[in-house]
């Protein structure tokens, strides 16, 4: 999944995610086109929707014979927003985007960001990539997440730190998803020898050193729990 900053306005946006503070003004959301502001204001008023923390609402909007999916997500009081709460909001929003089979999502923010740009990028990338994870390797008709890109429409003082955060978040998410893959594999696929091979490939990919212990050294180190698990496999 591509995650980046929106450098210039685009004429058509397939899916729009609005992260808005409670009692905030949609008309003041950075870079959000006026026609979308008007549409959102109408729905918010008609449905009496409030942007309380983790509140969610999605609806379609048609303009010039093109459909835009709009996802509203409340952040509540921005002063209470921390890394974990923000990560949860991204997960909620991305999950909804995947549910409606969005391919490209644009995130707009209607609050004063209390997080550092490094943490903002990190939480955004990590939450998005963890949310889209699917283990469908053995399905007859595997279906991956439709979401291919997320663009952030936000004025940042230091885009470099945001991009660095996105990179860090991506690394964290990829590591977690790798662990998920290993746990989800059956015992006849992941056993001590094959696990060592996976570890070697990961070390080569990310550039860190690795030492694979043999049976004798594992016994000398008294890694009894590891040995007990390994005995569950014929290999």
Language-model features and meaning:
Residues 1-235:
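Short amphipathic alpha-helical segment within the helicase RecA-like ATPase core
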């Amino acid at each position: 999944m591509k995650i980046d900053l929106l450098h210039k306005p685009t004429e058509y946006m397939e899916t729009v995610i609005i992260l808005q503070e409670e009692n905030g003004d949609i008309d003041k959301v950075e870079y959000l086109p006026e026609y979308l502001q008007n549409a959102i204001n109408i729905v918010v008023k008609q449905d009496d929707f409030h942007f309380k923390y983790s509140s969610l609402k999605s609806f379609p909007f048609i303009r010039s014979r093109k459909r835009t999916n709009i996802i509203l997500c409340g952040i509540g009081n921005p002063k209470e927003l921390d890394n974990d709460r923000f990560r949860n909001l991204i997960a909620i929003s991305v999950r909804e985007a995947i549910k409606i089979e969005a391919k490209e999502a644009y995130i707009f923010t209607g609050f004063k960001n209390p997080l550092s740009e490094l943490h903002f990028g990190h939480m955004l990338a990590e939450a998005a990539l963890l949310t889209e994870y699917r283990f469908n390797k053995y399905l007859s008709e595997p279906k991956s997440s439709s979401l291919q890109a997320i663009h952030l429409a936000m004025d940042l003082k230091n885009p470099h730190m945001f991009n660095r955060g996105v990179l860090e978040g991506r690394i964290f998410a990829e590591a977690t998803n790798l662990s998920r893959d290993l746990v989800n594999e059956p015992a006849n696929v992941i056993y001590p020898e094959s696990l060592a091979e996976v570890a070697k490939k990961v070390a080569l990919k990310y550039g860190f050193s690795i030492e694979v212990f043999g049976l004798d050294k594992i016994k000398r180190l008294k890694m009894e729990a590891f040995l007990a698990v390994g005995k569950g496999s014929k290999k």
